[in-house]
Regions:
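Zn2+-dependent metallopeptidase catalytic core
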Residues: 168-182
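An active-site-proximal "capping" alpha-helix that borders the catalytic cofactor pocket
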Residues: 288-304
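A short mid-domain helix/strand-loop element embedded in enzyme catalytic domains
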Residues: 217-226, 266-276, 303-306
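Conserved small/polar residues in nucleotide/adenosyl-binding loops
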Residues: 310-315
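Post-HEXXH active-site segment of zinc metalloproteases
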Residues: 254-286
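A short, surface-exposed helix-loop junction/capping segment
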Residues: 138-162
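Active-site scaffold of zinc-dependent metalloenzymes
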Residues: 189-243, 254-255
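N-terminal low-structure segments adjacent to metalloprotease catalytic domains
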Residues: 1-143
């Protein structure tokens, strides 16, 4: 799966006409709120929107496949003289902020505007997702993110057990079922360089057939984590478990990245986990590094949450 598509570019192509109409209506009714500055016009009479330019797109996470996005729109406004003693005109370039929401699963066909206001460049909207829709997770929030993950999908793992009793283990098979996923064992590559792959949609994927020594297409249902058996044979069962939890993190945290990719490439199907810790595809480096780093950091914290294990190290 090629990741790293630009949500801002998609918004520019998808929403431009609607944003233009909204800006036009706003200028007609609320241009005074823009505090237009002009050196030539003594008293503003008529104003007319000439053009708009999308300068910023800030995106934040919403439940499900919905996203909120704030568009910083630069307006080109022609200002005409309102004092009949003069015949001057000028052009102003104020910004407005148009707040929107939409559902990625329908390609933002349902997108709607929730508010419009003058843009405050000193206090821009905050991004909770990157332009590729990868969530921003600061290092000091990793434990909190892992705890929130478990609270939703495996709350018993957060239980602090009495002294002398082992904490509740996160069983990958149970976690997979709770997420509505399934696992499948297949040789992904001959050299065993791919630990696992998460398939979001049904696809005919190329897998290595150990019996024939060739690569052949096999049908993989959507919502499936494929784990290479070499992960266990050449390493440990713990490595296989970590791979499954790693892919579960991708499912919960990075589905929006996949949905955005699908809007550009309808053949996209999976995210892969390589031995080297990256994604096995031609990808945008920054987005891929963010996703893999997050999955690598969160997977062990989900399997050994701080709240359940810290007391084991205390004297």
């Amino acid at each position: 799966m090629a990741t790293g598509r630009s949500f801002a570019e998609f918004v520019k192509n998808k929403c431009y006409n609607g944003l233009y109409r909204a800006a036009e209506n706003y200028v007609d009714s609320d241009w005074r709120s823009l505090n237009l500055y002009t050196r030539h016009v003594h008293r503003i009479g008529e104003v007319e929107l000439v053009d708009v330019n999308i300068q910023r797109v800030y995106v934040h996470d919403l439940p499900g496949m919905r996203v909120g996005f704030d568009v910083g729109l630069e307006l080109e406004i022609e200002v005409k003289e309102g004092d009949y003693h003069y015949d001057e005109s000028d052009t102003c370039f104020p910004w407005i902020r148009i707040s929107c929401e939409g559902d990625l699963s329908c390609g933002l066909d349902d997108w709607e505007i929730t508010s419009i206001a003058p843009y405050n460049q000193k206090n821009p909207p905050l991004n909770s997702l990157s332009d590729a829709l990868v969530p921003y997770i600061p290092f000091d929030r990793l434990e909190d993110e892992a705890a929130a993950f478990l609270k939703e999908f495996y709350p018993e793992a957060l239980k602090v057990t009495p002294y002398g009793q082992k904490p509740v283990s996160v069983e990958p098979d149970i976690l997979v079922k709770r997420l509505g996923l399934q696992t499948m064992t297949r040789r992904v590559r001959e050299d065993g360089s791919v630990y696992g792959q998460l398939y979001f949609v049904d696809t005919d994927a190329e897998m290595f057939d150990a019996k024939t020594g060739t690569v052949a297409k096999q049908h993989i249902p959507g919502r499936t984590i494929v784990v290479d058996p070499q992960t266990v044979l050449l390493r440990t069962i713990g490595c296989a478990n970590n791979t499954i939890v790693h892919e579960c993190v991708h499912w919960v945290k990075h589905r929006k990245v996949f949905e955005l990719e699908k809007l550009y490439n309808e053949n996209a199907s999976c995210i892969s986990c390589e031995v080297v810790g990256g994604a096995a595809s031609a990808v945008a480096e920054q987005a891929t590094e963010m996703m893999e780093r997050q999955a690598n950091q969160l997977a062990p914290r989900i399997q050994m949450p701080a709240v359940s294990y810290t007391h084991l190290t205390l004297p």
